[in-house]
Amino acid sequence: MPELPEVETIKRTLTPCLREQKIARVEVYHPGVIAAPDPETFSRLLAGRIITGLDRRGKYLLVHLSGEYCLVVHLRMTGRLVFTEGAAPLAPHTHVVFSLAGGPSLRFVDTRRFGRLYLAAKAEVETLPGLRDLGPEPLDPAFDALALAAILAGRRRPIKQVLLDQRLVAGIGNIYADEMLFAAGIDPRRPAASLNHEEVARLRGAMQRVLEQGIANRGTSIRDYVDGSGRQGSNQEHLQVYGRTGRPCPRCGQPLERVRLGGRSTHFCPRCQV
């Protein structure tokens, strides 16, 4: 699933391509990916609108439009948003095409069809399911060690599961949770409330470094992810623990281990992470 760095990269690659572009028409090939309104109304309301900018909130992409509407995209597991010049053939699993004035298009492609598109009034975007309950942005300067400590206080769940809870912190998924816990030297199975002040500060710093590295490397392409231009990211070449079960820890040489936490594979070093 695209996480914060991937959605941020998509936003940054699409913004110069889409800003001030006019949507000429919208073709929906698989109605199930349109969450709201109905596909016919979705297409009709989008036609003729100007794209004024893009934002990200957690793992959601917000496409701001002229008038009173905003397009909200949640890519889920395998969704892609790709800007395409000219009349290139449709890729397999293309479900929505936003044709832009002058010939280019924005295409929503999703192998598993879990992704969802919403067209909502701007005043109602923050009340959409999923968005309304999102926690703070981990790269927000206001999200400091004190803010993280307040989230962890009193929580007995494993720290890994707390980091994945979008209601507590927005945008973190399985890959980056494993990487930031390794960077901080914290066992993912530890109760969140057991972290002391020094460990919380260390984790806060690791969160920022790991997420910023993911963005600098244009995201992690392990299976489906590509950016808004259709290019893969390179952060998979820099992963320290995720997907490296049995290989030597890059820090101490101990074989890395994998366990299941909350139904998710979790990768860590049994020696370095305590």
Curated annotation (Swiss-Prot):
The cofactor(s) it depends on are: Zn(2+)
> Which Pfam families has this protein been placed in?
Fapy_DNA_glyco (PF01149), H2TH (PF06831), zf-FPG_IleRS (PF06827)
The UniProt record lists the EC number as: 3.2.2.23, 4.2.99.18
Instruction: Tell me which stretches of the chain form a coiled coil.
Output: none
Q: Which GO terms describe its molecular function?
A: 8-oxo-7,8-dihydroguanine DNA N-glycosylase activity; class I DNA-(apurinic or apyrimidinic site) endonuclease activity; damaged DNA binding; zinc ion binding
Q: Where does DNA bind?
A: 93, 112, 155
Active-site residues are 2-3, 59, 264
The record describes how the cofactor is bound as: Binds 1 zinc ion per subunit.
- Catalysed transformations (reactions): Hydrolysis of DNA containing ring-opened 7-methylguanine residues, releasing 2,6-diamino-4-hydroxy-5-(N-methyl)formamidopyrimidine; 2'-deoxyribonucleotide-(2'-deoxyribose 5'-phosphate)-2'-deoxyribonucleotide-DNA = a 3'-end 2'-deoxyribonucleotide-(2,3-dehydro-2,3-deoxyribose 5'-phosphate)-DNA + a 5'-end 5'-phospho-2'-deoxyribonucleoside-DNA + H(+)
Q: Which InterPro entries match?
A: DNA_glyclase/AP_lyase_DNA-bd (IPR015886), DNA_glyclase_Znf_dom_DNA_BS (IPR015887), Formamido-pyr_DNA_Glyclase (IPR020629), FPG_cat (IPR012319), MutM-like_N-ter (IPR035937), Ribosomal_uS13-like_H2TH (IPR010979), Znf_DNA_glyclase/AP_lyase (IPR000214), Znf_FPG/IleRS (IPR010663)
Q: Give, as residue ranges, the zinc fingers classified FPG-type.
A: 240-274
Gene3D superfamilies, from UniProt?
Answer: 1.10.8.50, MutM-like, N-terminal
Its Gene Ontology biological processes?
Answer: base-excision repair
Alphabetically sorted, this entry's keywords are:
DNA damage, DNA repair, DNA-binding, Glycosidase, Hydrolase, Lyase, Metal-binding, Multifunctional enzyme, Zinc, Zinc-finger
PROSITE patterns, alphabetized: FPG_CAT, ZF_FPG_1, ZF_FPG_2
Describe, as the record does, how this protein assembles with itself and its partners.
Monomer.
Q: What does this protein do?
A: Involved in base excision repair of DNA damaged by oxidation or by mutagenic agents. Acts as a DNA glycosylase that recognizes and removes damaged bases. Has a preference for oxidized purines, such as 7,8-dihydro-8-oxoguanine (8-oxoG). Has AP (apurinic/apyrimidinic) lyase activity and introduces nicks in the DNA strand. Cleaves the DNA backbone by beta-delta elimination to generate a single-strand break at the site of the removed base with both 3'- and 5'-phosphates.
Family assignment from sequence similarity: Belongs to the FPG family.
Q: What is this protein called?
A: Formamidopyrimidine-DNA glycosylase
This protein's species is Moorella thermoacetica (strain ATCC 39073 / JCM 9320)
Q: Which gene produces this protein?
A: mutM
